[in-house]
């Protein structure tokens, strides 16, 4: 019997190891659980925290409702009447934020919780209640009681913009002079422009803005030698701060900025700053953990990016969102050398949504009643309470996520479309970057760093494609 002893011992050790490993069995809908050694929630692929049997037990899939198939400024066939009936203006609702520790910019800049009360800014996109599109405010009025007269700020004037940025709830904001605009899928939302002072608590104009693409989704505004940081519309304690302290190596009075996500939780987020004919690349030291973000609403922009990690695009994400071993700022480079086709000086910049190329559906026999821009905004599937019990989108919510060319496909079961339709061999994620200069803008493919070749060509009119103004010579 002696020879059996080693076999028995080995079997016992194997049992101990297997017992120590947690499983996703019956856990696929429980969400993030800080008390577990491994996770089974929908974001575990990004955080590299999934249990070993996550794929087998939970069968993670990228569905049609998780992706865009067109960039923001393109057009597609669209049944306007049906969309208007089903559509609603959905904005993420804020919770009382519990601010997690911000990624380290430098050792002496840690935010001390409770050091001083936060300055509440009535950031309208985070604070508004749900209402159908047809029930928007009357044009020229605002929820804050401030109305900008056309003499003060003419929407279609062609004046250059100072900044564009997506907020964590997917709302798109544009800044020009003393005013800011919130943009919907085709134009400016009713009630805008509003004074930057009334919405953000900062006197305009500002120089640049960006929103980090991580679970916290904090927004940064830059003006002169200082910057402000907001979470859920509330100014973080001890702000504003000097750019030289928080972003060492980045100059004051920047012209533009945009942020990119890390390729995964082990990677680093990047921000590009532009001033004059040069640009700087800055890399954050670290990003917040999933546990640190549990007390606040999840960034819808980050959620959309993290969902794409379910599929086989790891190598592409590493190529697009690579990171250097060390953080901080790199030496400045010339814009004209690295961003081909972009003017030598830009006024504003913004990272576009990630869309999947090669997924254009077959035309429907259904009559196409209209063509409309496809600037669908991000929609959080978790909603206000971040409930993860429902793993699939309803038909109505799925419609809000689809690009405009998908909405006219006719009747089908929206919940039956899984990864069989999405083949990485024939499609891949595309990250666009928008550069705004004067009254025109350019769309650049991040991977090639070249202006896209499309028809109509770039540069295109900001007023026409982003503000809903008539085309030059139009009515």
Curated annotation (Swiss-Prot):
Polar residues bias locations: 95-109
Q: Where is the SMB domain?
A: 20-63
Q: Which cysteines are joined by disulfide bonds?
A: 24-28, 24-40, 28-58, 38-40, 38-51, 44-50, 51-58
Localization terms from the record? Secreted, Extracellular space
Phosphoserine (modified residue): where?
312, 394
Region annotation (Disordered) maps to 87-123, 359-391
| Residue ranges of Hemopexin repeats | 158-202, 203-250, 251-305, 419-469
Segment Glycosaminoglycan binding region: which positions? 366-392
Residues bearing Sulfotyrosine are 75, 78, 80, 279, 282
Q: Where is the signal peptide?
A: 1-19
Q: How is it modified after translation?
A: Sulfated on tyrosine residues. N- and O-glycosylated.
Listed Basic residues bias regions? 366-384
Give GO cellular component annotations, separated by semicolons.
extracellular space
- Give the molecular function GO annotations: extracellular matrix binding; heparin binding; integrin binding; polysaccharide binding; scavenger receptor activity
Family annotation (SUPFAM superfamilies): Hemopexin-like domain, Somatomedin B domain
Q: In which tissues is it expressed?
A: Plasma.
Q: Motif range for Cell attachment site? A: 64-66
Arranged from A to Z, the UniProt key words for this protein are: Cell adhesion, Disulfide bond, Glycoprotein, Heparin-binding, Phosphoprotein, Repeat, Secreted, Signal, Sulfation
Entry-annotated residues carrying Phosphothreonine: 69
Could you give the subunit structure recorded for this chain? Answer: Interacts with SERPINE1/PAI1 and C1QBP. Monomer.
The domain-related comment in the record is: The SMB domain mediates interaction with SERPINE1/PAI1.
**Can you name this protein?**
Vitronectin
């Amino acid at each position: 019997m002696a020879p059996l002893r080693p076999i028995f011992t080995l079997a016992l050790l194997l049992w101990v190891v297997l017992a120590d490993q947690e499983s996703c069995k019956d856990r696929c809908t429980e969400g993030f659980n800080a008390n577990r050694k491994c996770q089974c929630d929908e974001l575990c692929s990004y955080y590299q925290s999934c249990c070993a049997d996550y794929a087998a037990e939970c069968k993670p899939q990228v569905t049609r409702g998780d992706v865009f198939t067109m960039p923001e400024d393109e057009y597609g066939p669209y049944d306007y009447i049906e969309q208007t009936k089903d559509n609603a203006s959905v904005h993420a609702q804020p919770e009382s934020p519990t601010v997690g520790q911000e990624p380290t910019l430098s050792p002496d800049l840690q935010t001390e919780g409770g050091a001083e009360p936060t300055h509440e800014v009535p950031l309208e996109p985070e604070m508004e209640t749900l209402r159908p599109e047809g029930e928007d405010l009357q044009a020229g009025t605002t929820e804050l009681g401030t109305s900008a007269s056309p003499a003060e700020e003419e929407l279609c004037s062609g004046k250059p913009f100072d900044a564009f940025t997506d907020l964590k709830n997917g709302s798109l904001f544009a800044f020009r002079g003393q005013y800011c605009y919130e943009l919907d899928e085709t134009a400016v939302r009713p009630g805008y422009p509003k004074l930057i002072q009334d919405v953000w608590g900062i006197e305009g104009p500002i120089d640049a803005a960006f929103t980090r693409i991580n679970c916290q989704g904090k927004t940064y505004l830059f003006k002169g030698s200082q910057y402000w940081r907001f979470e859920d519309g509330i100014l973080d304690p001890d702000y504003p701060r000097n750019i030289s302290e928080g972003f060492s190596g980045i100059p004051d009075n920047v012209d533009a900025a945009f942020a990119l996500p890390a390729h995964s939780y082990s990677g680093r987020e990047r921000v590009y700053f532009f001033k004059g004919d040069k640009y700087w690349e800055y890399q954050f030291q670290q990003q917040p953990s999933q546990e640190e973000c549990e007390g606040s609403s999840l960034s819808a922009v980050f959620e959309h990016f993290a969902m794409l990690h379910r599929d086989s695009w790891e190598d592409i994400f590493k190529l697009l969102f690579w990171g250097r071993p060390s953080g901080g700022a790199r030496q400045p480079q010339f814009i004209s050398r690295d961003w081909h086709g972009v003017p030598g000086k830009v006024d504003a910049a913004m990272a576009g949504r990630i869309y999947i190329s090669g997924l254009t559906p077959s035309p429907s026999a259904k009559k196409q009643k209209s063509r409309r821009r496809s600037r669908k905004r991000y929609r959080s599937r978790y909603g206000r309470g971040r409930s993860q019990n429902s793993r699939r989108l309803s038909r109505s919510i799925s419609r809000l996520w689809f690009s405009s060319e998908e909405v006219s496909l006719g009747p089908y079961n929206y919940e039956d479309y899984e990864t069989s339709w999405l083949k990485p061999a024939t499609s891949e994620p595309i990250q666009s970057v928008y550069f705004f200069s004067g009254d025109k803008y350019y769309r650049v493919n991040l991977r090639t760093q070249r202006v896209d070749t499309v028809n109509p060509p770039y540069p295109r009119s900001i007023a026409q494609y982003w503000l809903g103004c008539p085309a030059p010579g139009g009515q």
